[in-house]
Amino acid sequence: MAERPQRLSSQLLQTWFDEISEQVSVFGVLFNPAIQKQQLRGYYHTLREICQQPFTWLDTADRVANYRDELQALLRDSGIGDRRGSLVLTGSGSSLYVGECLNLVLQQALRVPVMPVPAGLILTHTEQALPPGETGLVVSFGRSGDSPESSAALDLLLKTKRQHRHLVVTCNHSGKLATRYQGDSRILVVLLDDATCDRSLVMTSSFTNMVWAARALGMIESLNEYHETTGKLAQVGKEILLRHSHALAEVCRSEFTSAIYLGSGASFGAARESALKMLEMTAGQVSTSAETFLGVRHGPLTAVLPTTLIVCFLSGERLVRAYELDLIRELSQKNLGMRKVILGEDVPTDLTLEGDMILECPSLNQAGDENATVLYTV
């Protein structure tokens, strides 16, 4: 097994928390109360797990790079190396949305069919759920690794699909997915830093780090590029937290009762995850949905009310962006929703109405749509 990197430095993270508290008053208000008060108010872990993400991505890239030989062997043994096999990305809830952020880019990079499949569907409809073929690779994602569907689905596949190979990506070193299969040569377990195993209800660090860990499958022959991209993403992620937190806090004070998140391609997976986060963090008080920019016209627009927040993850690709801008302008022309929040780079100012908000993210387009999902879900 690959050598495990040292644990992410708590001192490094605390220095960052201090810096962001000093520079951004919104975070100062949250970080400054005594830890016991933060815990009583229920946000102690969530706050840190959101803010630490840019640094955890750097650690995850180093950690995954140590598994290079094992990952190359796994791709070869599963038939993906010579394009005979298929790739399935599985999990439940947010862990499934990890796969939805990755399937298109991994399919393009590996030149094999790649499908996100819910772990529960594998349990109930095994033969229909999996791509046809005798061999393939199944990647199982799990923050805790203890959900009954995840381990049960893996147990089932080990019995019924004996030629398949498996990759487990998990944040919990003591969970079932991390400990139960160590003796099986068909399974490689990649453990992320314990700091990514979110203690709060919602998945934040765990989600983005599992996305970024598995992104390496498509860049395993070019790890220098993988590390360079990680550095760019970490810098943009820090800038989002430093530059836009006041604006986002102001949005949160709006009295919206529902929210819809729009994304294209890989960003639709980010939209799904973001919608779930809003639903969970408001305890269901804000109803949420996610759609593609082109799909929202076909029925879901009827659910956009005067009290609906519309969040748009804008593509950096010219053709994709043209379709997205057309839809956003239609929303403005029809005066739909309470307000729009548009996240992107070089966003045209004519898109917005009074009350709308543009979150400019320099270098976002350079990171690429296929990698920006970790930024959209911060």
Where are these regions (language model features)?
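Active-site phosphate/pyrophosphate-binding segments
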Residues: 49-55, 60-77, 82-83, 181-311
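Extended, charge-enriched "interface" segments that sit outside catalytic cores
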Residues: 4-26, 32-33, 46
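Glycine-rich phosphate-binding loops that contact phosphosugars or nucleotide phosphates
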Residues: 4-12, 80-232, 313-364
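Peripheral docking tails and interdomain loops at the edges
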Residues: 7, 15-19, 356-378
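Short conserved micro-motifs at the rims of enzyme active sites and ligand-binding pockets
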Residues: 273, 322-324, 353, 369-372
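Acidic, two-metal ion nucleic-acid-processing modules in DNA metabolism proteins
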Residues: 36
